[in-house]
C-alpha cells in the first residue's frame, strides 16, 4: 500500500498550523467548560428484549416501593420489558435551569435491545453528588437485533445504546470563576512557549503593555474588568484577535496497530543507507489417512505431509543524502515497495542510528 495519500494529508495539516488563527480557535478560557453528568435508571416498555437479572428486579421493586407498592421480599417479578441503564450527559457552561440537554442511555445488563423503550425519571448527578438535571423520555435507537428459534441472530449497529434529544431538564447551574477575580486566563489547547508569548504580545498590542503575560507554555493571564457585562464584551473582543501559532516540532507519528504513518514537513534525515529485506517462511501441513482393505487385517494410519517453502525478497538499498525531505523519503520508500509495517521498522532503525531529525512517536 502506498503512503503518499496519508503523507500528503499530513502536509496539509502541518502547513495549516502556520497561518494566523483566532484566539478562540487555539485556546479556552480557564474555568469555562462542560461538566459530565451520570445517572442510574430504568427503561420500560421493551418488546420482550429486557432482562431478568437480580439487580434489575431489585431496582424495579425499589421503584414500585417509591410509589407506595410493597412487594414481598421473596417475590421475584417476571419482567421481560424492563432494563437497567446508565444515563449520561454533558452539561455546557452557563446553561440555566429549565434548559434541556441531550442524554445517552446505555444498557448495563443483558438486555438485547432498547428499541421501543421509555426511560423513566432519572436523576443526573455531578462528581460532587448533587443532582443537576432530570432525564426522562422515549429513546431513539439506531440499531436493531432479531433472533430466530433456531438460534440464528442478526444485529445491526448497537441496539443497546440510545439517545434522547432534549431528554433532560437542567435543575441547577454550575458555578464558574468567569465573573470573579481580576484576571482571565487563556489555556492553549496545544502547549507551546512561542505560541503563548505570541498570544500575550497580540493582546498587549491591542490593549497596552502589561495587560497580558504568559504564565507557562500553556497559559496566558489577562487583566480583566470586574463588571460582568464589561467582561463579556472584553472577552468577545479578545477571542477574535488573530495569532500565528508557532510551527510544530518535527514529528513522525506511527500507529502500530493500523499501520498509519504521519510525517511532519520539518522532518529531515542525515546521510544514511537503508536496505530492508524480507525473509518469508511458509509451512503447509496436509493430513493423509491410510485405510487398508478390511480383509487384510491392517490398521488405519494417519500421516502428516509437511511442505516448507522459504523465499527472500530481492529489495534494493537506497541512500538518504543530507537534508532529505519528506517527498524524497516517500519516493525512496515507494521505490523499494515497502509496506507501512516495513516503514515503521525503517523509521525506528533510523531513529536509533541518529539519522532521523524529529521525534518518533508510536501510538
From Swiss-Prot:
It holds the Pfam family FlgI. This is Flagellar P-ring protein. The basal body constitutes a major portion of the flagellar organelle and consists of four rings (L,P,S, and M) mounted on a central rod. One of its GO terms (biological process) is bacterial-type flagellum-dependent cell motility. The gene is flgI. Assembles around the rod to form the L-ring and probably protects the motor/basal body from shearing forces during rotation. It is found in: Periplasm; Bacterial flagellum basal body. Disulfide bonds: none annotated. The lineage of its organism: Bacteria, Pseudomonadati, Pseudomonadota, Gammaproteobacteria, Alteromonadales. PANTHER family: FLAGELLAR P-RING PERIPLASMIC PROTEIN FLGI, FLAGELLAR P-RING PROTEIN. Residues 1-20 form the signal peptide. Belongs to the FlgI family. It comes from the Bacteria. GO terms for molecular function: structural molecule activity. GO terms for cellular component: bacterial-type flagellum basal body, distal rod, P ring; outer membrane-bounded periplasmic space.
Amino acid at each position: 500500500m502506498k503512503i503518499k495519500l496519508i503523507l500528503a494529508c499530513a502536509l496539509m495539516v502541518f502547513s495549516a498550523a502556520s497561518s494566523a488563527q483566532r484566539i478562540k480557535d487555539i485556546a479556552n478560557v480557564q474555568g469555562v467548560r462542560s461538566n459530565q453528568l451520570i445517572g442510574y435508571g430504568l427503561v420500560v416498555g421493551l418488546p420482550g428484549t429486557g432482562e431478568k437479572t437480580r439487580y434489575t428486579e431489585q431496582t424495579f421493586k425499589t421503584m414500585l416501593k417509591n410509589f407506595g407498592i410493597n412487594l414481598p421480599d421473596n417475590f421475584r417479578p417476571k419482567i421481560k420489558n424492563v432494563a437497567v441503564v446508565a444515563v449520561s450527559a454533558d452539561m455546557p457552561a452557563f446553561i440555566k435551569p429549565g434548559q434541556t440537554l441531550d442524554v445517552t442511555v446505555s444498557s448495563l445488563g443483558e438486555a438485547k435491545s432498547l428499541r421501543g423503550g421509555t426511560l423513566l425519571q432519572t436523576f443526573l448527578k455531578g462528581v460532587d453528588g448533587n443532582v443537576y438535571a432530570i432525564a426522562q423520555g422515549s429513546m431513539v435507537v439506531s440499531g436493531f437485533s432479531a433472533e430466530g428459534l433456531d438460534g440464528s441472530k442478526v444485529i445491526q449497529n448497537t441496539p443497546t445504546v440510545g439517545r434522547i434529544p432534549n431528554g433532560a431538564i437542567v435543575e441547577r447551574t454550575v458555578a464558574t470563576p468567569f465573573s470573579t477575580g481580576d484576571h482571565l486566563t487563556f489555556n492553549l489547547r496545544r502547549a507551546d512557549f512561542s505560541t503563548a508569548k505570541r498570544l500575550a504580545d497580540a493582546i498587549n498590542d491591542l490593549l497596552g503593555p502589561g495587560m497580558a503575560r504568559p504564565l507557562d507554555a500553556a497559559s496566558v493571564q489577562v487583566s480583566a474588568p470586574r463588571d460582568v457585562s464589561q467582561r463579556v464584551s472584553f472577552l468577545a473582543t479578545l477571542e477574535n484577535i488573530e495569532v500565528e501559532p508557532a510551527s510544530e516540532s518535527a514529528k513522525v507519528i506511527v500507529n502500530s496497530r493500523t499501520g498509519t504513518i504521519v510525517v511532519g514537513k520539518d522532518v529531515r534525515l542525515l546521510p544514511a543507507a537503508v536496505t530492508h529485506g524480507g525473509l518469508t517462511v511458509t509451512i503447509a501441513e496436509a493430513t493423509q489417512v491410510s485405510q487398508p482393505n478390511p480383509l487384510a487385517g491392517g490398521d488405519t494410519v494417519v500421516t502428516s505431509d509437511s511442505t516448507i517453502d522459504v523465499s527472500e525478497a530481492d529489495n534494493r538499498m537506497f541512500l538518504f543524502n543530507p537534508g532529505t525531505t519528506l517527498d524524497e523519503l516517500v519516493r525512496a520508500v515507494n521505490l523499494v515497495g515497502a509496506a507501512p509495517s516495513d516503514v515503521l521498522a525503517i523509521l525506528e532503525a533510523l531513529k536509533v542510528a541518529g539519522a532521523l531529525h524529529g521525534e518518533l512517536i508510536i501510538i
